[in-house]
Amino acid sequence: MNSNLKLNEDETFEKVSELKIGNYVDCVFNKCDLNNFNLANFSFSQCEFIDCNLSNCDLKNTKLAEVSFESCKIMGVEFGVMNQFLIKLSFKECNLSFSSFYQMKLKKTWYMKCELEQVDFTETILSES
């Protein structure tokens, strides 16, 4: 967690289309449209994204620790540029088409009933996924 950023804890965000840079802990994002949004340097810990559009988001140096995505559209996202320290993700019924997980270590990552058309898993470690 970046101590210089605002802490947002135990909050629910409904149908938002932008977020302020910060640390988000135990938050729920429901039906948010963050298509093409710059999430660089954000931090999300123990958060849930439900029915959100995160397509083409910039995740440069973004932290995702124990984050779940359900029924989300996450197309064309470059996950490999994230901060990969303590990364733990799960995806259920998401569209991840045209995204890239190039050279990531994604042990025990769940991809349940997801659309994965032309996803780049080159040199990705997916053991126990």
For every predicted segment, state its role.
Residues 1-129:
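Tandem repeat scaffolds
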